[in-house]
A protein has these predicted regions:
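Conserved beta-hairpin
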Residues: 71-100
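C-terminal "cap" of GNAT-fold acetyltransferases
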Residues: 171-210
Length: 210
């Protein structure tokens, strides 16, 4: 196992469950997973930027992150902890900084999508990405969801967490008709609609059954 998480549950002023997890990486790093806040948006955008430039993740405007911020969790590196800049004996960051993120977007009463999973380049291979994904899956279970979808180039990574490739549209016609009312590109990718295929070439459509 690449990381260990110890969770405590609290409540944000909005009533949204505030899950906090301490994550220990294979490099000895310690980071905190927590719900994202509006103040994290620019850090999230900066994490995603190099992935979007390589077309691994979809580029988004800042306003999109603000609109969806309640779907995100972030991994925060705490001053004095090992991690990027500190795990190899170098200086730890002077202030907390965001070194990972991921989002869970609900698409139907039994279905959600993992979106925008990204980690700082220095944190790749430490188990942080897996820890974020496991936390998003845990949130899906808590909400009573039965399936989690992802659109990804990283098929081996998601496959290691139980996701399997899918073909076609794994919903009935009534649900399909309702989903067509949405303008969301992620939902269109789940439905395998032609309008998003130019932007998803090479991606695998994968599904996890909970």
């Amino acid at each position: 196992m690449n990381s260990t998480a110890v969770r405590t549950d609290e409540h944000l002023p909005t009533g949204r469950a505030a899950r906090r997890a301490e994550v220990y990486g294979v490099d000895g790093s310690r980071r905190i997973l927590r719900p994202a806040r509006p103040a994290d948006v620019r850090a999230i955008a900066e994490l995603v930027r190099p992935y979007a430039e390589r077309r691994v993740l979809i580029a988004k405007d800042l306003i999109s992150y603000f609109e969806d911020i309640q779907e995100f969790i972030v991994a925060e590196e705490i001053p004095g902890d090992a991690g990027p800049g500190g795990a190899d004996g170098g200086e730890a960051p002077a202030e907390p900084r965001i070194v990972g993120c991921g989002a869970l977007h609900v698409m139907w009463d039994d279905l959600a999508e993992v979106r925008t999973l990204a980690v700082h380049p220095d944190a790749v291979g430490t188990g942080l990405g897996s820890a974020i994904l496991r936390e998003l899956i845990a949130q899906a279970r808590e909400m009573g969801l039965k399936r989690v979808f992802c659109l990804t180039f990283e098929e081996p990574f998601f496959g290691a967490h139980g996701f399997v490739p899918i073909e076609g549209t794994p919903v009935g016609m009534d649900v399909f008709a309702e989903m067509l009312r949405s303008h969301d590109d992620g939902l269109a990718a789940f439905l395998d609609l032609a309008r998003v295929k130019p932007n998803t070439l090479g991606n695998a459509r994968m599904l996890l059954h909970l």
